[in-house]
Every structure is written in C-alpha cells, then in structure tokens.
C-alpha cells in the first residue's frame, strides 16, 4: 500500500480525502478488491478522519465491496482511469504498485518538444561552444538524427579557423568526406586508411605486429625502412610511397581534416594549435579500452632473452597478482632491435607494462589501456555521452555539458522485456534462436557478433556506430550487450571506485526515469559504468533506423529499456503491428 501511495495519484487523493467524484471511488474500490485485504484497507481509509465529511460516506461501501468480490469483477485497466494522464501507470493499479519481474515501469513521462525546437537548441549549443576561446571539453548530447552532422558541415563552410572532425570508423570518415564535398567544402582532406592502398598482406601484417604489441609509434618508421630497402620495381613500392606521402601531407594540411577517433589521439601536437576539434560521437571507448593476455603467454614472455631485466621483473610481479590492482607507473622504452624480436608475441606488451589498472586470475590478465586526450578545446556531439563519467576520469579538466530537449520519434519501438536476452540465454538454446529468427524474418537484425550468422546479418553490437545504411528500415535489435564483468571493474577503478570482491545480483533499479530488473551491482560507480555501456550500445543500434525522422519500426529484444519504446513483458509469436 505504501508503493501505491507513492505512485498512484487516485489512491493518494483517496487517502487524503480529496476525491469529489463517486465514480472514481468505485473505480478505486474495484482495483483494491483485487488485492489481499484490499476490502479491509478500503474501509479503513473510507472511515478515516480525512474522509469523514465527504458526501460518499452515506453510501453502503461494505455491501458494494462484497458484491465486487462475489461477482469476481476484474481489476480495471489504468487506461480507463480519470487520473490516467497524471501518473506513470502500469497495466492496472496492482501491477503499478507491484510490477512483475520483467515489467518496465515509467516513473516520469518525458515532455517532448517539436523537432525544430530540438534542432535549434542543438545549433545554439554548438555555435556557443565553437565561439568560446576557453580550453574546455564541451559535451553536447542530442538525439540520433537530430542533425549533428549537418550542423558541423554547415559551420565548416564559413569557419575562419579550420577544424578536425573525428568519427568512430573509417567507413563513417569516408561518408563525412563525401558529404562535405556535396556541401561545397573544398579545402578538406581525410587521413589515409592503409587498407585502401592495396599493399601486400606480407607488409601490412608485419606492420600490424607492431600495433599488436603496442608499438604503434614505430609502425610507420618500419614502413619507411621497408621502403628504403625495396626495389622500385616492387609492386608495393609506389603504394607504400603514396601512403607515407599522404600521411605526411594530411598531418600538415592547413584546411579541414576528417579522421578517426583512434587517429586523432596520435596526430602531431601542432595540428591542435592550428585547428579546432569536433568529436562526432563519444570517444570514451577509444581513449579507454581493455585487452587481455593469457597467464601462459605472460609467463612465456618472462623467459624471453630479448626483454630487459626491468621488464621481466615487472611481468613476473603481474603473474603473482590476483584480483583488481592499481599499478605503479612504469616507463618502458624498448630498442628497435628488441621490438623486431618480440613483435611476434601478439601481446600488447607496451599497453600491459604501462597499465595502471589490471585484473588477474589464474587464467589471464586483463588490463586497461588509456590514451592521452589532447589538451585543447574539444566539442563533442553525441547521443550517448555520459557527463558523470567524464567528470570522474578528468577531474582537472573543465567540462561543459549541454543536453538538448528531446523530440518524439516519428517511428515506433516495440521492446520485449520477457527475458534478459543475455549471451548466456542464447547458449545452446536453439529453440529461442529459431523463434527469434521467425519473428525477425522481415527486418534487418543487429545482434551479438557470435550469433549474427544465425540471423543472416553482418551487423552486430560494436560495429554499427554512426552508419547510415539502415536509415528508414525496419530493424530488430536482439540481445543485451553486457560485457565481461572485469571490463566494468577496470572502468570503474579508473572512475574512482575502490574494488574488493564485487558481484552482480538481480535487483530492481531506477535509471533514466524507468524502474526495471537488472542483474547489476550495489556499488554506484560500477552500476553507472554498466548502465551507461548497456544503454549506449542499445541506443546506438536502435538509432541506425533514424526514428526521429523516419516512419519505420524497431523491435528490441533486451531486458534493458531503450527510450520511447512500448514495453511488452510477454513474448508473443505475432509481432505488434
């Protein structure tokens, strides 16, 4: 009854003696009679001091309640209540007070603005950030398809100072470069992608070896040295020459530059002195990423004669660790000849040695790699950025956060929350996969990478960020993209959490004005990291349909609620039309 008092305004008005309409009292009586001891509670409130002077005291409510119970009248739907628009109700009064395990309850209704108002707010926030001379990290959060790309492309046409646009992938980089040309932006270039130059696999794989051990700074030098020892008649000679020339020319380019998030973090410092920086989408998971090495491979490296004693001592110390640890700083500079000898390890040795946060068990060591974020003004446009996370990992940087008001989707989302739809739920559950394949047969599917072939798709969590190929199409997003618990733990440590033994357990939580069950943590920082990562991956997947401007449908099968969805806690064979 306490829950009902908190979430049902009709019941609240009844307890406070504020109901004037007898019909509302009867509606409430039918609802309360559906609960254990509901009749007793109703009469207790009816005969309370606050209802003593009400006109409906003359009615024989005891007789009415007995008739409701005897006739087995159903609990009425909240949709038929006069208070319907004043609360975040569930199916009926009882489920509102005590929702089922798989039910998503909306605690506060979103107030939407029209699309033009939301778009104009984005324009204003962006122009304010670009006009500022302060060295701040400007985080502008706006819905997918609100017009973020066109906003900065229009700015670039007349900007006095050139800009660097950083996007998540090479594919999106090419799309933005193409769109910029269509906008009439001429003084512009894109950083090169070695995969498009046709250089032989022998060379590119050898170069990749250096990236794999964390010696990316040496990779281009290796390529230049390879060119010096290569005959001009070699088919790779002209291709490598052109690639190196393009790398050098783009780094010195005085016009606009389109690049990837990863490449941005390794551009020469001089670029940030002459260019403004715009981040298209959140760069957090490029700055911070996790990698693992098996304990067996680690122990093997400690016996390598090509590594200095200081490095082997550090690795031996890591082998003895168990659980989460914050490591002391360790400076590592290996000689060129050593790099060539250890490049076949296939382990990010530099990343491991420099890692401040690690987790070790008997099988493997997982570590957090952190790239340096350039010390200059940056303007980020993202649908999923988390202000609190940036404030925690960059406490000494000035951060300006703006969230644009939301517009209502033109398209529709139907979300099935009858199961968590976790990776574990799909393991060897061919019946479930078969059912979902049938339900998703007329849509394009985004799901886990390891089961995408089951749905005849090449779209999976982690590779759809920013793409436009699915615009206006009916989609099915299948799965709850939970990451390994160790990943959450390492991110949380970087955000200031002090971890001992922490475990997930099923619990009802509140997130973005919704109440729902999730297998999550009691620790607030861990929960913040997990919910942000889940939300951002699901919203990125849903956002590919561009529902804000496109009248299409997205069907979501996941136990974590996405925005503006109709939540359905029972899976039916026929999808909602």
Model-flagged regions — what are they?
Residues 102-577:
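ASCE RecA-like P-loop NTPase motor cores
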Residues 1-104, 166-167, 471-477, 524-528, ...:
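Modules that initiate DNA replication and primer synthesis
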């Amino acid at each position: 009854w306490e829950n009902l008092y908190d979430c049902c305004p009709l019941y609240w008005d009844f307890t406070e003696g504020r109901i004037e309409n007898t019909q509302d009292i009867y509606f409430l009586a039918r609802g309360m009679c559906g609960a254990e001891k509901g009749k007793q509670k109703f009469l207790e409130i009816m005969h309370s001091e606050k209802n003593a002077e009400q006109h409906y005291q003359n009615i024989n409510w005891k007789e009415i309640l007995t008739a409701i119970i005897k006739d087995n009248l159903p609990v009425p739907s909240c949709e038929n209540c006069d208070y319907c628009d004043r609360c975040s109700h569930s199916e009926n009064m009882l489920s509102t007070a005590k929702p089922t395990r798989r039910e998503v309850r909306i605690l506060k209704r979103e107030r939407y603005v029209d699309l033009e108002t939301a778009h104009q707010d984005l324009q204003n926030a962006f122009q304010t950030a670009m006009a500022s001379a302060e060295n701040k990290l400007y985080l502008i959060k706006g819905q997918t398809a609100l017009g973020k790309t066109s906003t900065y492309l229009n700015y670039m046409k007349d900007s006095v100072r050139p800009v660097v646009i950083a996007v998540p992938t090479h594919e999106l980089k090419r799309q933005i470069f193409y769109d910029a040309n269509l906008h009439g932006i001429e003084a512009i270039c894109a950083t090169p992608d070695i995969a498009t130059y046709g250089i032989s696999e022998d060379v590119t794989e050898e170069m990749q070896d250096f990236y794999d051990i964390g010696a990316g700074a040496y990779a281009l030098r290796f390529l230049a040295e390879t060119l010096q020892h290569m005959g001009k008649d070699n088919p790779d000679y002209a291709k490598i020459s052109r690639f190196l020339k393009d790398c050098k020319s783009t780094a010195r380019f005085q016009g606009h530059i389109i690049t990837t998030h990863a490449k941005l973090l390794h551009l020469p410092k001089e670029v940030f002195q002459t260019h403004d920086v715009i981040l298209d989408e959140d760069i957090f998971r490029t700055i911070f990423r996790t990698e693992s090495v098996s304990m067996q491979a680690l122990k093997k490296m400690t016996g390598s004669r090509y590594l200095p004693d200081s490095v082997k001592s550090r690795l031996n110390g890591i082998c003895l660790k168990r659980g989460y640890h914050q490591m002391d700083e360790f400076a590592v500079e290996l000689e060129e000849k050593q790099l060539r000898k250890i490049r076949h390890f296939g382990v990010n040795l530099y990343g491991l040695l420099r890692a401040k946060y690690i987790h070790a068990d008997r099988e493997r060591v997982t570590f957090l790699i952190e790239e340096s974020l350039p010390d200059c003004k940056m303007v980020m446009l993202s649908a999923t950025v988390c202000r609190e996370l940036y404030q925690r990992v960059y406490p000494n940087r000035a951060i300006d956060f703006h969230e644009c008001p939301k517009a209502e989707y033109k398209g529709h989302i139907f979300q099935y929350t009858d199961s968590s739809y976790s990776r574990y739920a799909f393991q060897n559950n061919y019946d479930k996969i078969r059912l979902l394949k049938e339900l998703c047969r007329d849509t394009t599917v985004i799901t886990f990478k390891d089961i995408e072939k089951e749905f005849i798709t090449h779209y999976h969590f982690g590779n759809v960020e920013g793409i436009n190929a699915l615009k206006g199409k009916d989609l099915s997003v299948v799965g709850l993209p939970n990451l390994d618990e160790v990943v959450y733990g390492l991110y949380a440590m970087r955000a200031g959490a002090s971890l001992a033994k922490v475990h997930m357990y099923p619990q009802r939580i509140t997130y973005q004005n919704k109440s729902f069950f999730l297998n999550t943590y009691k620790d607030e920082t861990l929960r913040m990291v997990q919910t942000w990562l889940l939300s951002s991956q699901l919203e990125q997947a849903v956002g590919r349909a561009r529902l804000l401007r496109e009248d299409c449908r997205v069907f979501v099968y996941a136990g974590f609620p996405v925005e503006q969805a109709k939540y359905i806690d029972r899976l039916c064979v026929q999808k909602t039309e």
